[in-house]
A protein has these predicted regions:
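Short edge-strand/loop segments of extracellular domains
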Residues: 155-159
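Sec-dependent bacterial lipoprotein signal peptides
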Residues: 1-14
Length: 216
């Protein structure tokens, strides 16, 4: 009886040790900033929060130029009065924009941790400018879609009380967008010479956002 219990205990301990093992390929946050590939992948992920202008192909139905016959579009939600906090224009672009902003802030806060021999100072400067442009772009679209927004200067913590954050005055929001864009003008090129950078922001794109924001 004693031998049987001892054997069962040994088997149980062995099973626990086997199940408690950590996957060898499990990535940590620190590992992101150890290699160029991982750091660049993090930046590219921020670009993924940019939504397409064709997200809702029947936007004409928002006005009176035409009627929308599709039943599963955002247009129907508006004209039928079915919009709510969790069911908004464009599949809640408010949430998508702030996710992109938070990731951009994390990127800018940590990109300098990548070793110099892995990622040059010039590339770090370029990537930070791209990230600031993306933040400005997200904020600019928040302003256009929803009006004044909440400004984050650093990544938010998960346990923060977000009720303490308030929307800033409209003029302050415009200046904030313009400030982010202006901070990229001496870094972003007029034209990217390599096809590897197609789709990246340019100096002209930043100036275009500034001019549109000033006209609001």
């Amino acid at each position: 009886m004693a031998v049987g219990l001892l054997s069962a205990g040994i088997i149980g301990v062995s099973s626990c040790d086997y199940l408690d093992q950590k996957p060898e390929n499990l990535k940590t946050t620190d590992m992101i900033w150890e290699t160029r590939v991982e750091a660049e992948a993090y930046l590219y992920n921020i670009y993924g929060y940019i939504w397409l202008s064709t997200d809702d192909p029947v936007v004409f139905g928002f006005a009176d130029e035409t009627s929308c016959v599709f039943s599963n579009t955002n247009v129907r939600n508006m004209v039928e009065g079915n919009w709510g906090p969790s069911n908004t224009l464009g599949d809640n672009k408010w949430s998508a924009a702030y996710r992109g902003i938070q990731k951009a802030l994390v990127f800018e806060q940590n990109i300098d941790r990548v070793p110099e021999g892995v990622l040059s100072t010039d590339l770090k400067t370029q990537y930070k400018a791209e990230s600031r442009f993306l933040r400005g772009w997200f904020y600019w679209n928040l302003l256009r879609l929803y009006g004044p927004f909440v400004i984050f200067e650093k990544p938010a913590e998960q346990d923060e009380d977000f009720n303490n954050y308030v929307r800033r005055p409209f003029d302050e929001c415009v200046e904030y967008v313009c400030g982010l864009m202006e901070s990229t003008l001496n870094v972003l090129p007029d034209v990217w010479t390599s096809t590897a950078y197609l789709g990246r922001p340019t100096r002209g794109a930043a100036l275009a956002v500034i001019s549109q924001a000033r006209l609001l």
